[in-house]
């Protein structure tokens, strides 16, 4: 299928009675590098590097513009040739149309009410990505499946395909429904932190086997700190992590943190063994609208994250999915200062479900955390009273005047983003 377009073009030329020169002379179009990328010796991620163009560099596409495994064959300014993945470059026509976005150029972050758990569907004009697929029980999983079926019934153009599934860490409230999703829909790629143990180890093992059996693209061994180190302060990306390439406004997806195999300065043994600190941190940009997902990352890892990116703007975002369901250890002043978010969304259960593993039992979200978030969030909202936890199984009322939302308060929450950075919020209750 991948080679059908070039064959059709060649056939059309023959019908017209035209002779054509070698591919490198028949077609030439300059493209601009959108973000730092590796030009490779062959059209595959495992091949050697030729060079490392930076954003703004221009390359010339060869081979009639055909792609091989998602890679363009390109010529560099110094005459060398290599292969670059198509999501890292922009054609002039794309630049022209991106400047004036169309009515359909909208992204939506669907924060799905999973009770005490997490699942966020990112909807783009040309694809969809899922971050986590966990909930407190099978009822939450039923809701996720129903939500996704309704979504794809509306977005028939996506053909029941999730371009990538990310699981931030191996806890059951983040991957309980993972296999149900994988078996119900087509999965284009799978990314996790590679940690085999934790309360979500059974879904993690089942998904690992499923990925291998179905040849689903993945990051072998999971995203780890060595990969993040090699990416520098740009974050880790590539065709598996960022598989969505829309023609007018192209989303940018990066992983900013992954698994730690060794302690960082200031970490205790307990910090390293804590699965929450191994959470993937995912940054998504759609035009000027930027989102950050920190999983269940706690204070030691958060401080390491802030330190790593202190000289970049990658943590400066508009929407934050609050870490660790609004637990006090998932929110820090330094992270809030680095983000300066316009709004925040907490994925947590409601305070009226008095059961094991519930928001009520854990005491989520904590008053201290909500207070810090409300002080940092820039957008205001009409005053509304919500229940917050003063401790496990102890709740009282908090009056929100800032744009802080929670699935336990508001149900399913949609944050719609336009390329110019305009954000609107709707919820199911």
Predicted regions, residues:
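Bacterial N-terminal signal peptides that target proteins for export
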Residues: 1-14
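Active-site-proximal loop/helix segments of hydrolase catalytic cores
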Residues: 111-120, 125-158, 166-183, 256-360, ...
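Bacterial N-terminal signal peptides
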Residues: 12-22
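Flexible, acidic/histidine-containing loops and adjacent segments that form or flank the divalent-metal
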Residues: 94, 98-107, 114-115, 150, ...
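Structured surface patches comprising rigid loops and adjacent beta-strands/short helices at the edges
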Residues: 86-94
């Amino acid at each position: 299928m991948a080679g059908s377009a070039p064959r059709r073009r060649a056939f059309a030329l023959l019908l017209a009675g035209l002779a054509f020169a070698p591919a490198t002379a028949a077609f030439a179009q300059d493209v601009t590098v959108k973000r730092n990328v590796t030009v490779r010796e062959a059209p595959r991620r495992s091949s050697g590097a030729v060079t490392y163009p930076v954003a703004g560099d221009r390359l010339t596409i060869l081979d009639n513009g055909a792609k091989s495994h998602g890679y363009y064959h390109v010529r560099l300014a110094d005459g060398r040739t290599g292969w670059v993945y198509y999501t890292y470059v922009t054609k002039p026509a794309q630049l022209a149309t991106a400047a004036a976005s169309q009515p359909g150029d909208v992204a939506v972050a669907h924060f799905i009410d999973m009770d005490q758990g997490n699942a966020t569907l990112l909807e783009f004009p040309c694809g969809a990505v899922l971050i986590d697929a966990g909930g407190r029980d099978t009822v939450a999983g039923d809701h996720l499946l129903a939500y996704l079926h309704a979504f794809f019934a509306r977005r028939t153009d996506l053909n029941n395909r999730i371009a990538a599934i990310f699981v931030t860490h191996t806890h059951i409230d983040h991957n309980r429904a993972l296999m149900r999703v994988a078996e119900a829909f087509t999965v284009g790629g799978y990314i996790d932190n590679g940690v085999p143990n934790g309360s979500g180890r059974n879904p993690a093992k089942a998904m690992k086997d499923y990925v291998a059996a179905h040849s689903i693209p993945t990051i072998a061994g999971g995203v780890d700190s060595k990969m993040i180190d090699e990416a520098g302060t740009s974050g880790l990306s590539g065709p598996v992590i960022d598989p969505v390439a829309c023609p007018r406004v192209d989303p940018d997806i990066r992983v900013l943190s992954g698994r730690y195999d060794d302690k960082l300065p200031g970490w205790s043994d307990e910090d390293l063994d804590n699965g929450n600190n191994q959470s993937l941190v995912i940054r998504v940009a759609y035009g000027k609208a930027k989102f950050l997902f920190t999983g269940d990352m706690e204070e030691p890892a958060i401080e390491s994250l802030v330190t790593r990116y202190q000289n970049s703007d990658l943590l400066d975002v508009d929407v934050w999915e609050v870490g660790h369901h609004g637990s006090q250890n998932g929110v820090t002043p330094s992270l809030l200062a680095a983000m300066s978010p316009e709004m925040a969304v907490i994925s947590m259960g409601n305070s009226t479900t008095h059961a094991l593993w519930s928001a009520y039992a854990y005491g989520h979200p904590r008053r201290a955390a909500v207070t810090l978030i409300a002080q940092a969030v820039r957008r205001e909202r009409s005053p509304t009273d919500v229940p917050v936890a003063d401790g496990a199984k102890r709740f009282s009322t908090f009056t929100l005047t800032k744009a802080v939302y929670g699935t336990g308060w508001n149900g399913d929450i949609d944050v719609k983003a336009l390329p110019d950075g305009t954000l609107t919020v709707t919820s199911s209750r």
